[in-house]
């Protein structure tokens, strides 16, 4: 019997954003609150079902994007990420997609947490937000970084 293994025990929660992403991109303020009803985490399976395969393929595309992004390519261990993807890595999530609840932010936070190059180094919050926004831009074209930052620090942000 195939066993799905969690990569780590950390869950990355969805979020509730008051005042909207577009406003943040245009330098307005917003309040972001972690919403623990929905969450996601990285897992492995040696026999991926269709949903897990889709996630695995999406992670492959994200890894390729990271490697081609000059700003973040040296901040993520893509060799390890690619190896894990080939070994059945996927993102399991209860976060509804396309509703603005932070499904892409949770994926980005999980990837950064698990594959960041600079382990043990505390970055300034704005530096971390910039890294996460660059990675999340894979999903949306332009990201403020507030969604993955909220998922990563798991605290309300203003």
At which residue positions do the language-model features occur?
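Alpha/beta catalytic cores of group-transfer enzymes, especially the acyltransferase/condensing modules
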Residues: 125-158
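ATP-binding N-lobe of GHMP and related small-molecule kinases
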Residues: 2-100, 113, 117-121, 154-156
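Conserved acidic
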Residues: 103, 124
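Short amphipathic alpha-helical face segments that pack within enzyme cores
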Residues: 106-113
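A short glycine/serine-rich beta->alpha loop
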Residues: 92-102, 134-142
């Amino acid at each position: 019997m195939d066993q799905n293994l969690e990569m780590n025990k950390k869950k990355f929660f969805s979020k509730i954003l008051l005042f909207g992403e577009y406003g943040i991109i245009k330098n307005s303020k917003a309040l972001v609150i972690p919403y623990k009803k929905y969450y996601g985490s990285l897992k492995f399976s040696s026999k991926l079902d269709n949903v897990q395969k889709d996630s695995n393929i999406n992670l492959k595309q994200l890894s390729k994007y990271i490697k081609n992004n000059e700003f973040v390519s040296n901040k993520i261990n893509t060799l390890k990420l690619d190896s894990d993807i080939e070994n059945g890595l996927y993102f399991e999530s209860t976060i509804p997609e396309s509703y603005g609840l932070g499904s892409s932010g949770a994926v980005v936070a999980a990837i950064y947490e698990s594959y960041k190059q600079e382990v043990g180094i505390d970055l300034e919050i704005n530096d971390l937000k910039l890294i996460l926004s660059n990675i999340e831009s894979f999903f949306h074209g332009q990201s403020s970084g507030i969604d993955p930052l909220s998922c990563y620090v798991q605290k309300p942000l203003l």
